[in-house]
Amino acid sequence: MSQYQNQYGAQTGMTDEYGNPVNQVDQYGNPISGGGGLTGEAGRQHYGTTGGATGQGHGHGQQHRGVDQTTGYGTHTGGVGGYGTKPEYGSTNTGSGYGTGTGYGGSGTNPDYGSTNTGSGYGTGTGYGGSGTTEYVREEHHGDKKGVMDKIKEKIPGTEQSRTNTDGTGYGSTGQGYVREQQHGTGYGSTGQGYVREQQDVHHGDEQHGEKKGIMEKIKEKLPGTGACTGH
């Protein structure tokens, strides 16, 4: 009996005030058996990556005669963490804008063509002067006066019928070459000069039947060798 009393006495310290056995718990709330009972270790299962809720420990204590067996089931189930399925994709920005604007300038079709007369103005200035005229003058003086030139010719030796052959240098009209000037063309026409030989054949047949003579006629009479030219 004493053995049983010692056992019961030892067990009385593990009962509450009503005689019910008291289950001792650890710092996590899991029951600890005081006798030869088996204490089940709370199994912990954690799911998810975020912090889950605190687990709930359900302890079921059953006391049998002579056997203090406490089986604790700790089902500490953590909350399942949500999966971050929001990938933020940056825009690839593969829009390659092709600036293929090849601006073609309008071809300049406004060439200023200078005159093809590259300074060679064609002034074929062959100016032809008036052709020399041969004048036959027959003067018959039936009056008193003679001209001045007639009187001089009478006093010159051998000029009874003096044939004057004057080689004059008659200048023809200057030929002007007209150059058609287009844009920026400068053509110069050379002025041509034509030389004309004038030949004048003057034949004087003088018949004088007057009385008075002019001044030049008197001068001619005074010249030597001219007495045969005049007659009174």
Curated annotation (Swiss-Prot):
InterPro entries assigned to the protein according to its UniProt record, in alphabetical order: Dehydrin (IPR000167), Dehydrin_CS (IPR030513)
Region (Disordered) residue ranges read 1-66, 140-232
Its BP terms in the Gene Ontology are: cold acclimation; response to abscisic acid; response to water deprivation
Q: What's in the GO CC field?
A: cytosol
Give residue spans, biased composition: Polar residues. 1-14, 159-168
Q: Which UniProt keywords apply?
A: Stress response
Q: Which residues form a coiled coil?
A: none
Q: What induces it?
A: By abscisic acid (ABA) and water stress.
Gly residues composition bias: which ranges? 49-60
UniProt biased composition (Basic and acidic residues): 140-157, 198-223
Family indicated by similarity = Belongs to the plant dehydrin family.
Instruction: State the name under which the record lists this protein.
Output: Dehydrin DHN3
Q: Which organism is it from?
A: Pisum sativum (Garden pea)
Starting at the broadest rank, the lineage of the source organism is: Eukaryota, Viridiplantae, Streptophyta, Embryophyta, Tracheophyta
